Amino acid sequence: MAKNFQSVLLLVCLSFLVIVSSPQNAVQADTLIGSCVWGATNYTSDCNAECKRRGYKGGHCGSFLNVNCWCE
């Protein structure tokens, strides 16, 4: 009886770990695509529009002094 209980408990724990670690439950991070600063190599005049053009929901300039274009 004890071995059967341990087996069931192990199965429940493993099932929980598989569900929790599945990719669809992960939070998707923003993606850095370039710079929002004049004169930079990857300058994007409109970060939000460029992100939408690439298939993201939108974008924003962020990080220290808002120098990076992040898509979400």
Swiss-Prot record:
Signal sequence range: 1-29
Subcellular location, principal: secreted
Cystine residue pairs: 36-61, 47-69, 51-71
Induction info: By bacterial infection. Induced by A.niger alpha-1,3-glucan.
UniProt-annotated location(s): Secreted
Family: Belongs to the invertebrate defensin family. Type 2 subfamily.
Function: Has antifungal activity against A.niger (MIC=2.1 uM), C.albicans (MIC=8.5 uM), C.fructus (MIC=8.5 uM), F.oxysporum (MIC=16.9 uM), P.pastoris (MIC=16.9 uM), P.tannophilus (MIC=8.5 uM), T.harzianum (MIC=4.2 uM), and Z.marxianus (MIC=8.5 uM). Lacks antibacterial activity against the Gram-positive bacteria L.monocytogenes, M.luteus, S.aureus, and S.lutea, and the Gram-negative bacteria E.coli D31, E.coli ATCC 25922, and S.typhimurium.
Name under which the protein is recorded: Defensin
Organism for this UniProt entry: Galleria mellonella
